[in-house]
């Protein structure tokens, strides 16, 4: 039998959910609600629930983790039905342990049922990212190491995924190809000399504004030695 090791204590972070994240969420919410409700809405809820019925539900965590996505949940229900109110009892970036209430959602039962799965999908996905990142951050705590993210995100989800990384205590790297230079093996191969790292760094630095960082990935000690001659960022 294998002895299970206790998970590392998860850190808490407090990133800001800005209008940029809200705009990104709005587009995803629109697509998600259209995907789930189609043109005819929630057939089951409308068939079984009186349109005047009012109620309250709690959103609760069932495991340890880092919360992320509560503002998206509120935004989703506001988009679905402006009569719905969401009151949070936790915050994004907060590490939670024992199962408890993260938020309460009030009013039209039809709307609560129509939006619950989509809201939980957002909350679960983003909290999962934040929790996994926090676990890695906890492992390297005290070493001076930062945990950075990449561009390997689901299309359309990058802004929110990177927000979730920040909620987990990770560090956002470039948002896209537009806001930084990262020289990779394919760039070096495309130039015809995979070992000429310093030359690529110098060429890139001369070609872009000074405000853009120029960074490089290396696979070997030889590449690292060559790259350091050009002092990449």
Q: PLM features: residue spans?
A:
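Acidic/glycine-rich phosphate/pyrophosphate-binding loops and surrounding catalytic core
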Residues: 2-230
């Amino acid at each position: 039998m294998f002895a299970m090791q206790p998970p590392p204590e998860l850190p808490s972070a407090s990133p800001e959910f800005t209008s940029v994240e809200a705009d990104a969420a709005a587009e995803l919410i629109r697509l998600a609600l259209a995907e789930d409700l189609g043109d005819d809405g929630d057939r089951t809820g409308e068939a079984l629930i009186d349109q005047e019925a009012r109620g309250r539900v709690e959103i609760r965590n069932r495991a340890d983790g880092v919360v992320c996505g509560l503002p998206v949940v509120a935004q989703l229900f506001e988009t679905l039905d402006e009569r719905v109110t969401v009151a949070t009892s936790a915050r994004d970036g907060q590490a939670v342990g024992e199962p408890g209430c993260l938020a309460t959602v009030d009013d039209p039962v039809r709307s609560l049922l129509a939006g619950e799965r989509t809201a939980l999908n957002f909350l679960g996905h983003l909290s999962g990212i934040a929790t996994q990142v926090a676990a890695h951050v906890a492992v390297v705590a005290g070493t001076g190491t930062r945990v950075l993210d990449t561009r390997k995100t689901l299309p359309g989800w990058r802004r929110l995924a990177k927000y979730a990384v920040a909620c987990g205590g990770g560090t956002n790297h470039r948002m896209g190809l537009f806001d930084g230079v990262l020289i990779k093996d394919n760039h070096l191969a495309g130039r015809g000399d995979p070992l000429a790292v310093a030359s690529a760094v110098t060429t890139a630095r001369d070609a872009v504004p000074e405000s853009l960082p120029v960074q490089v990935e290396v696979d070997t000690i030889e590449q690292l030695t060559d790259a350091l001659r050009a002092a990449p960022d």
